[in-house]
Amino acid sequence: MIVQAISRALAGHHLSRAEMADVIGQIMDGGATPAQIGGFLIALRAKGESVDEIVGAASAMRSRATPLVCPRRERSIDTCGTGGDGAGTINISTLAALLIAACGGVVAKHGNRALSSRCGSADVLEALGITIDGEPETVTRAIDVAGIGFAFAPKFHAATRHAAGPRKELGTRTIFNLLGPLTNPAHVHHQVVGVYDRRWCEPVAAALGALGVRRAAVVHGAGGIDEIAVRGETHAAVWDGATVSSLTLTPQMFRCEEVDPAGLAGGDAAHNAGILRRVLAGRDVGPGERHEAVLHASAMTAALGLELLEPGELDLARLPDQLRRARAAATDGSARLVLHKWQEVSRAPVGVDLTVLTSRLAAVTAGELAGVE
């Protein structure tokens, strides 16, 4: 199948969803050689991947993933982005996920270690004391108790190992760079997705809709970042459950002042984790506008996610209110408490008495954690 698919792609012909699912299935089942995998990925990129091809590939990955049970799935959300923008920013989507969980969202965070940056979501969470490669039941328990859990992509998508070598040797973006946000093993109902190139906003939003996501917002910010920009415009494609619409977001729509995006510059896992800890402890991360840049970016992402979770029609006029909720979670200790519970649950052995653990964690208050980083 893959040999014929390479020929078709080289001739400029798109594959159907079913054909694409068959080819990706062949790759993931170990039925293709490294040369065939590399040739197919490059032929696809040269042609340009279609929405049907993206959906077919994601469907094949989803069907082979280790399933993840997500409590309260009707409130479930993920902030996993594509990465690969080369900007080296702080882990904004991870901080936003904590803010959403603190505001009552049910977060099943999908992610991996860094590919093009120095620190991916898995790296910073590990530095924050989260056990990132937990078994599915451990992740489910974390979602249930803390409101947030982490699905480590290599753990839940073991079959992608067959494409890892060719992807690394190619050293360029391929369709697999788009598939992370589309293959959350918890099958969340809502998503905020940052993409590395504006041209992917509408196709990824359409693909999410085709895969059964109820609501999603796909964003690409000024300066080429896969986040909502803290200065300038952000292009967004929104899937509302029926159609994809395009719009422009600005900090002013959230009632945020524009700040210097240089404040979003990140470092290695220890550096980024330190910044997240200080934000959640209500401490300044300076210098200059750094604190406001990190807080604005994460709170805007969280606000957009919280609006996706609202019943009824999406109302962008509510974004300032959602932003206030998200910022409050960062400053009143709520998100810090979520992180503490997550740390405890993720490290607890499988089989531990969940009733006792939950009761103990329920007794911890944000006030008791005040001043602790």
Residue ranges and their predicted role:
Residues 114-130:
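Active-site-proximal loop->helix
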Residues 8, 14, 63-66, 89, ...:
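Glycine-rich anion-binding loops and their surrounding alpha/beta cores
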Residues 81-86, 111-117, 156, 222-223:
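Acidic, glycine-rich active-site loops and adjacent beta-strand->loop/helix elements
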Residues 48-111:
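Active-site cofactor/substrate anionic-group-binding motifs, chiefly glycine-
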Residues 1, 9-55, 63-70, 297, ...:
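N-terminal glycine-rich anion-binding loops that anchor highly charged ligand groups
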